[in-house]
C-alpha cells in the first residue's frame, strides 16, 4: 500500500446505527487515526444528511480530519423520521476521485453499494469494505467484497468512545 493515496468513503448513518446496535459509541477521532494508521487513508469522506442543529458535531468531525459531504434531509410525512440517504453521493464521489486514489475503503453494511464494491474489486481498487456489524451486513455486500470485508464488531476497545472519569 502506498502512503497517502488511499481514500475512505463512509456512509455515516449506516456506521452510526450499526455501531449503536452493537451497544457502543464510536470515537470518530480515534476512527480517523485508525484509518490513517492501518489503511494509509489520506482522505476520509463522510456522507451525511444536513441538520442545522448539528453544526458543532460537523465542526468536530472536520477537526478530526473528515471531509463532510452533505445531502439535504427529508422528513417523512408518515412517521416524522428524518431521511438523508447518501448512497448516490458516495458512489458518485468514489467515481469522481477514481483516478486520484490507489485503493478505496467503503464503510457501510448497505447492499446498495454492491455494484460499486464489485467494480472497485474488479479494477483492483478495493482495499476493504468495513461493515459495522457482521449480523446486519448485506449478503450482497459480503459476496461482492469477498475476502476484502472486515467487521467492526471487535474494535470496541480500540475505537469505542470512553467517558472521562470525573473522580
Residue spans for each PLM region:
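Terminal and domain-boundary accessory regions
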Residues: 1-167
